Amino acid sequence: MVKHIYSCGRYLLHQATRISRRQMIACLAVAISIFNFQLSTLKAQDTVRKLDEVIIQDVRVSNKTPLTTSTMNREQLDEARTAVSLPFMLETQPSVVASGENGGVGATALRIRGVDGSRINVNINGITLNDPESQEVFWYNIPNLGGMAQSMQIQRGVGASNGGSPAFGAAINMQTLNAQNHPYGEADLGFGSWNTRQYSFSAGTGILKNGLSFDFTYSGLTSDGYIRSWGTDQQSFFGSVSWYGERTLIKLLTIIGSQTTGITWDGAYDYELDADPTYNPSGAYTMDGKTLYYPNETDNYWQRHYQLYVSHLLSDNWSLNAAFDFTHGDGYYEQMKNKKYKAYGLTQYEDGSKHNFVTRKELYNNAYTANLAARYNGENLGLSFGDNFLYYDGEHFGSIIWFRDTAVHLDTPYEWYRNYGDKYDNTTYVKANYDFNDNLNAYADLQLRFINYKVYGYADDLFDMHFTANYLFFNPKLGLNYRISDNQRTYFVAGISNREPRRSDIKDAIGRGDTILPESLLDLELGYQFASARWNFSANLYAMLYRNQMTPNGDVSSSGYALMENVEKSHRIGIELQAGYQPADWFRFDANLTLSHNKSVDFTYTDFADGDTVLQTVTANTDLSLSPSIVGAAIATFIPVKDAKIQLIGKYVGKQYADNTGRECYAIDPYFLLNAKASYTWHLGGTNEIEAQLVVNNVLDHQYRLNAWVGDYFSDDASWYGYYHDRAWLQQPGINFMGRVIYRF
């Protein structure tokens, strides 16, 4: 269980859930000391490369596989690390929309083809990173995740089979840092707007004479944030110990992340933001007729991943891979609430009035993962088969840690709810690539997935949320790839994906007395690619046809997660265009554009004009929520002199809607952002160099707002009697900057 320290009527999460400076210094000392070992030149680099590739071979695909992909190597990831959060590192990739509450330094979100993050499968070396219950990746729980990556591949559509909830629009496959040939080190310091400070320190030994390699990265980020009363303190640690044998690789890896961040998801009304664009209502309460703000309105979380990988080359054709992971997480939201006693089950004290309460909603969970895979690479046939097993257990519980009512005696902390979740998830798959000849090959990927999910206990609003379900899904994918010439190819793939509801979807459905259904997707992709020394072009047509798709209804819970609803029939149909041109060594231009049609079919909802007392039922083909029909990005890169680089980066996101009704009152205006980046590198001899960077975001100082939540409500006030539309916004920052100095050795 989470340990607590009690102080002055409040309690704090045990300080062990932070990465201490002593721990950081110890890691640095170990990293420095291991440089004293002699390096090895005995390991054949081809063997090292093959062993590293075995770890990710079942989640990565080559350009012979008929899937729609974008891959970023280490150099490209370093280039994108001027963005603090991984979603913003990826925002120039096709069909990607990144958003955040504080300019990308706090809570951030990622959507691909309009699909939200809980439907994007994210994995690290083939082990799923998505939380098994929420199916989300909370990026700020592990800051600088991109700095831990050797490469990253985005698979759009249903993607290749892997563990965890399958891709329902995209998958992100991350490969962690590989061992290097020689020792290395890097110190990265940055400072930017809103007193933002970021820092990271990395080092590695290279492969030593005994086959061992040690690598680590420590990162931190603090910021006051753009929005008032926000602030964040984030830390992460990546450590890896690898042993390379003649045909075997054993790797121990740990990733630790912690964060404390102010809550901003409540959003604010137009008139509030017009008066103060940084206004944040979270934590507001009234005392003696004055409005005050609770200073510790925070989201706090600590996450630890411990992983073991064993890869072995049985022969020139056969390889085996085993991976094991243990993940532990614990954390809490602390909030000031103004509610009645009955909201916390304290009906014996109910007096009809609202009172100030400080509450904590806590989470404590563990996940255990085992992946086993075998692969055969023949002259004409590539075959792989494997099994992914995951077990998850978690607890959700909430306590009142302080309240203001001298007439009532209540021992604090007072726990008012607790519930549990257990989930078994097993995936078995077989994949094959067969070459009919030098130009034509076929791809098949068959996945069988079984889930047993049980939730029991009482929810935060006190209803019994007992739920047990078994799901059995068959997810096949079939495709053809045709090589037109040495630099051209075309492909077609059809795939089916099925997935279970999230815990929050189940909880909300139980509370409403509804039935929540699993989702199904039929994905069709037809693509063309051309690449030459100076330019490249690709076009991809896609049709994603859904049954019972879960989409945001525009509202959010008290804990900040999006509330969802089943849409019986819906589709996302579009074309993705991507091109790059380098007419000279000193200039390159890259761009991508997605044009799409994202609709719910025969969607039924109720509508009204503000002040109406009667609702009208409407059935129509409406836009899916948060799914813009136009998304584009462009990068112009200039190299005016050797070791200097200037980039202009543009991002356009078209009009979208906050819910699934397509009503103009809930529309989000389109926006265009222009960022600029300049860098220069000084070479100091050997591998020593210093790079200075300056990034200016939103150069045009465009003022825009993104959605926090929307909802219809009924007012029984005599002067405002009737139905009304309601919405809140998250103001996005104007022009801001980040400067960095990087020393590599």
PLM regions with names:
Residues 184, 191-222, 227-264, 298-301, ...:
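Transmembrane beta-barrel wall of Gram-negative outer-membrane proteins
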Residues 128-156, 175-177, 272:
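Short acidic/polar hinge/loop motifs at secondary-structure boundaries
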Residues 313, 319-325, 483, 489-495, ...:
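Membrane-embedded beta-barrel scaffold of Gram-negative outer-membrane proteins
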Residues 255-257, 433, 492, 588, ...:
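Conserved C-terminal beta-signal and adjacent last beta-strands/turns
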Residues 301-458, 481-493, 530-531, 535-541, ...:
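Face-selective signature of the C-terminal outer-membrane beta-barrel domain
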Residues 52-83, 109:
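N-terminal periplasmic "start-of-domain" segments of outer-membrane beta-barrel proteins
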Residues 87-128, 150:
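Extracytoplasmic beta-strand/coil segments of soluble accessory domains associated
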Residues 438, 543-545, 565-660, 742-744:
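Gram-negative outer-membrane beta-barrel transporters
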